[in-house]
Design a protein with these regions (language model features):
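Helix-adjacent hinge/juxtasegments
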Residues: 54, 64-107, 112
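Donor/substrate-binding cores of folate-linked one-carbon enzymes
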Residues: 23, 28, 36, 89-187
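N-terminal Rossmann-like dinucleotide-binding module
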Residues: 1-41, 45
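Amphipathic, non-transmembrane alpha-helical secondary structure
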Residues: 18-22, 44, 69-76, 175-178, ...
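Short, surface-exposed acidic-centric catalytic microdomains
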Residues: 28-70
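Amphipathic, non-transmembrane alpha-helical scaffold segments
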Residues: 10, 64, 68, 166-174
Length: 187
């Protein structure tokens, strides 16, 4: 059985991209990294691993649909069947959603529906909750509102700092995302 060809979208450091690349026995090949930040460290990680990169600057386009159409063409040219968002800090628009309906997955550092959007760990910490978590979900037009695939909780300890909590959340992300990717691609 041939491996699925996937793309990973990331905007910053790419720790979840790295976790996907490091995971063993995934039934896929990461064919493309899509990034919207020209100086993101994830680009260097991809290049070091011989993963092709597609880097765009949204301000170079008149509309979201324009750059998303260019992304769709790049994905189709490479036979990409799934998209996995890994710290991609842009909302996915209709052009991508229609082209890859039911095939775009995101990982979010909270136990959704709590703390959607940016700085979810900081939001959870400031709210003083007893637990936060990690959610893997399908992407829809909303902000972290798509159907949930899997979630796991992360306790917030009384002596936690944002940094210690973030480390535990990231550790879970790096374990959970490859596990869910494997499950989805083996269906």
């Amino acid at each position: 059985m041939s491996k699925a060809k996937i793309a990973v979208f990331a905007s910053e450091t790419g720790s979840n991209f790295q976790a996907i690349m490091d995971a063993e026995n995934l039934p896929c090949e990461v064919k493309l990294l899509v990034c919207d930040q020209q100086n993101a460290t994830v680009i260097d990680k991809a290049r070091a691993l011989d993963v092709e990169t597609f880097v765009f600057h949204a301000k170079d386009y008149q509309a979201k649909a324009d750059y998303e159409q260019e992304i769709v063409e790049a994905l189709r040219d490479r036979g990409i069947s799934w998209i996995f968002l890994a710290g991609y800090m842009r909302m996915v628009g209709k052009t991508l959603l229609q082209a890859y309906e039911g095939k775009i997955i995101n990982i979010h550092p909270s136990f959704l529906p709590a703390f959607p959007g940016r700085d979810a760990i900081g939001q959870a910490f400031e709210a003083g909750v007893e637990a936060t978590g990690v959610t893997v979900h399908f992407v829809d037009e909303g902000m972290d509102t798509g159907p949930i695939i899997e979630q796991e909780a992360v306790p917030v300890f009384i002596d936690d700092t944002i940094e210690t909590l973030q480390k535990r959340v990231q550790k879970l992300e790096h374990r959970l995302y490859p596990k869910v990717i494997k499950q989805l691609l083996q269906k």
